[in-house]
Amino acid sequence: MSKVKTLILRTPGTNCDIETSYAFELAGSETEMVHINELLAKPSRLAEFQIMAFPGGFGYGDDLGAGRVLANEVRLKLGEKINRFHESGGLIIGICNGFQALVKTGILPGPMKDGQKITLTENNSGRFECRWTYLAVNPFSTCVFTQGIDRLYLPVAHGEGKLLGSPEVINKLNSVVYYTDKDGKRNSPYPANPAGTLMDIAGIADESGRIFALMPHPERFVRGSQHPRWPAEGLKEEGDGLKIFTNAVKWARQV
């Protein structure tokens, strides 16, 4: 397949859709922003795409909890269609608020029919965390999005990023990325782990490796110039986040 199309899902309160669209276009995909109401009216539109993105933001104002309203809409009205999309080889990524929604639908860690198993809740600091973080990628993960990546340096911006679940569930997660300190050491204290999330987990995937979600924002660092200290630190032209999107597009193109 030469042409790849990515659906950028929008809801009231989504505010990272433009950056996510730009990241996928930079990676070689065509994109289309589709409002949730349009998708609810015509779920068959999913068949037009190879990748589906749940961007960051504050969907529905997070009034009932981060990602909760969107999760209910997806689970109750789009669940079967999304399952078919995934079964046909489609890729799904959730970023920040998108991660929260995917967790609350049960899509992650999955399967959706088993319901919600984990949650993302208030940061230990009790405040909104907006900072740059160092991440290590699990070399044993099956995640399509992170193949060939060892380390990442990405920003976070969230108030509810603390991953919680029973020890049994947490230990079985397909954990993909972890918070570390600057030297790559895990189990580092705040602010290296900005939310206080269990086992330093910053992102997970389903068993197939084709559904991936993370709290940091890769779409906010696809060019070196997006970093506030780009000239001073002599950062390369390509930001760390871009590889996540190019991996997805490359994989979708081969299907």
Swiss-Prot record:
Catalytic activity: N(2)-formyl-N(1)-(5-phospho-beta-D-ribosyl)glycinamide + L-glutamine + ATP + H2O = 2-formamido-N(1)-(5-O-phospho-beta-D-ribosyl)acetamidine + L-glutamate + ADP + phosphate + H(+); L-glutamine + H2O = L-glutamate + NH4(+)
Subunit-structure text: Part of the FGAM synthase complex composed of 1 PurL, 1 PurQ and 2 PurS subunits.
GO biological process: 'de novo' IMP biosynthetic process
This protein's encoding gene: purQ
Organism of derivation: Dehalococcoides mccartyi (strain ATCC BAA-2266 / KCTC 15142 / 195)
Name of this chain's protein: Phosphoribosylformylglycinamidine synthase subunit PurQ
Matches recorded under InterPro entries: Class_I_gatase-like, PRibForGlyAmidine_synth_PurQ
Any Pfam family hit: GATase_5
Stored PROSITE patterns: GATASE_TYPE_1
